[in-house]
Amino acid sequence: SCNTATCVTHRLAGLLSRSGGMVKSNFVPTDVGSEAF
């Protein structure tokens, strides 16, 4: 439905954040994880 590069980029980023957000947060937690490792 959207053709502009910006819109496509945002849609891809949204899909990645939704599908890979849980996995990323498990392997790369923000602050607490860096201290734990």
Curated annotation (Swiss-Prot):
The keyword Secreted applies. One of its GO terms (biological process) is calcitonin gene-related peptide receptor signaling pathway. Keywords: Amidation, Disulfide bond, Hormone, Secreted. It is found in: Secreted. Disulfide bonds join 2-7. One of its GO terms (molecular function) is hormone activity. GO terms for cellular component: extracellular region. It comes from the Eukaryota. The modification Phenylalanine amide is found at residue 37. Belongs to the calcitonin family. PANTHER family: CALCITONIN GENE-RELATED PEPTIDE 2, CALCITONIN-RELATED. CGRP1/CALCA is a peptide hormone that induces vasodilation mediated by the CALCRL-RAMP1 receptor complex. Dilates a variety of vessels including the coronary, cerebral and systemic vasculature. Its abundance in the CNS also points toward a neurotransmitter or neuromodulator role. It also elevates platelet cAMP. CGRP1 can also bind and activate CALCR-RAMP1 (AMYR1) receptor complex. This is Calcitonin gene-related peptide 1. The gene is CALCA.
